[in-house]
């Protein structure tokens, strides 16, 4: 029986797989994502999952980032609303897009109300 490429290089694959079990690596990846733009909590969890991190690690890392003030749903919502207003989208469309991201309705309406005063 011939050995597969993965069997012959198991130490390479094991070290590659193990980094996805490391919460510190997950935190670094999450911070890399947040350095580019704001993310909603659930969106960031899903982004980490899509990169290969477990549900548990993804959720705990994002929860800690939220506690540390590095991730904030209100900040994400305000940033999202501003970008959509610049694109010429109306309040109803913006609200629908935010609701599709499973963000708290109270935060959405509060941010829309605050930004409506500015525009």
Where are these regions (language model features)?
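An alpha-helical, amphipathic repeat domain used for nucleic-acid recognition
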Residues: 1-119
